[in-house]
Amino acid sequence: MKPLSSLLLSAALSAAAPPHPASPQAPLADIPRIGVETRTEFSQNSLDDVVNASPLLSFHRDLVSIESISGNEGAAGAFVADFLESHNFTVIKQPVTTESDARFNIFAFPKSQSHSLDESHPSHGPQILLTSHIDTVPPFIPYSLHRDANDTDDRNILIAGRGTVDAKGSVAAQIFAALDTLAVQPPAPLGLLFVVGEETGGDGMKAFSQSTHLNPSPSRFHTVIFGEPTELALVAGHKGMLGFEVAAHGHAAHSGYPWLGESAISAILPALARVDHLGNIPVEEGGLPASDKYGRTTVNIGQMEGGVAANVVPSEARAGVAVRLAAGTHDEAREIVLKAVRDATGGDDRVVVNFSLEGYGPQDLDTDVAGFNVTTVNYGTDVPNLQLHPRPDGKVKRYLYGPGTIHVAHGDNEALTVAQLEEAVRGYKKLIQAALDRSTS
């Protein structure tokens, strides 16, 4: 897939924000506007007409226009649920938090197959699952449309706003791929799962995995198609993840008399210097492993804090670290990190490592459907959070595919083109058909 035009990606024309709880991010004043001098033939009305004429683009617009930052997904979930119910789907809203019913996953399947959702006969339910997430990262950025003044091709219209790419583009394309498939193959055993909380640890997908009703044993699904921005390529796998905090504890004192205290920052620095280079150190020398498929393991010290003032010996210091694992297990990586910190500090018990999340190793995925480019990615997904039970007939096929590029997914230039969204529908239909063919062969 060709990269998006850098000019188009930097555009952010003013658009009125819908009345949602989070404050929208204002367009940056110094970002150039597209075709200001010659844009009269491409009025906002003409751009809106293109979207209004397409059920796919209209649904995507309406979904993106609803703020759904992680923790506040209720309105977006209700919109998706209502849409699916109006298109003859049975919709189950699975609560994710016990405090309220405002956060829920959406599990849906054709009403004509409702009788088959039976725990005692899981093989009779939906067998092909399309799944993505409806939450986004902050801040909310309003939906907007942009077009180069010299481009008359509607397919090149740029659709911008928070979630256009990650991952409401996948949600929209998956829904319309399912609708198109069911229109010509009504018995197709399709299920749709749209979860909350993917951006903040995956509590939505974990809740689905733990449901014996929705996720019975043995698994009813023989194929799962995950939706994330992959530039319309099939992903052969993505790196694993390990998150942790390095913390040091000291004793405060006046900076004029530092020997009366113990500097937590001085204690933590050798540990961080060692951790920062673990991805570049050979395994036999105590480093983190690499692989031919995923390259090097990467380490990012993304947060640091410590001390209260420059003239006070700091009593506390801490740093947050994210590791993208190219090989091995997260348990093995933990041991490597712990040993590195011990070696760097000489076993100083004032410096400790706290592992915040469970973590996971590299995730290998299927790419056995012809007609797609194949790639690997470095970002994390809900793939490891979906824990399916074994099937008597073998392993579950897992695919990762979707429109847009991760390079803009969390930025203020998040956007994709009409062509990418429409092509994603065709791509998902191809993956669905391959799964249907497999189940009947």
Curated annotation (Swiss-Prot):
Cofactor names from the entry are: Zn(2+)
- Where found in the cell? Secreted
GO MF annotations for this entry?
metal ion binding; peptidase activity
Q: Which residues form the active site?
A: 198
Task: Name the residues that bind Zn(2+) 1.
Answer: 166, 199
Q: Which Gene3D superfamilies does this UniProt record tie to the protein?
A: 3.30.70.360, Zn peptidases (3.40.630.10)
The cross-references to Pfam families, in alphabetical order and at most eight, read: M20_dimer, Peptidase_M20
Against InterPro entries, the record matches this protein to:
ArgE/DapE_CS (IPR001261), Bact_exopeptidase_dim_dom (IPR036264), Peptidase_M20 (IPR002933), Peptidase_M20_dimer (IPR011650), Peptidase_M20A (IPR050072), Peptidase_M20C (IPR001160)
Determine the domain of life of the protein's source: Eukaryota
Family annotation (PROSITE patterns): ARGE_DAPE_CPG2_1 (PS00758), ARGE_DAPE_CPG2_2 (PS00759)
> What's an example Gene Ontology biological process for this entry?
proteolysis
This protein's GO cellular component annotations are:
extracellular region
Q: Which residues get glycosylated? A: 88, 150, 354, 373
User: Family per UniProt?
Assistant: Belongs to the peptidase M20A family.
Name it.
Probable carboxypeptidase NFIA_052450
> Which species is the source of this protein?
Neosartorya fischeri (strain ATCC 1020 / DSM 3700 / CBS 544.65 / FGSC A1164 / JCM 1740 / NRRL 181 / WB 181)
Lineage at the top is:
Eukaryota, Fungi, Dikarya, Ascomycota, Pezizomycotina
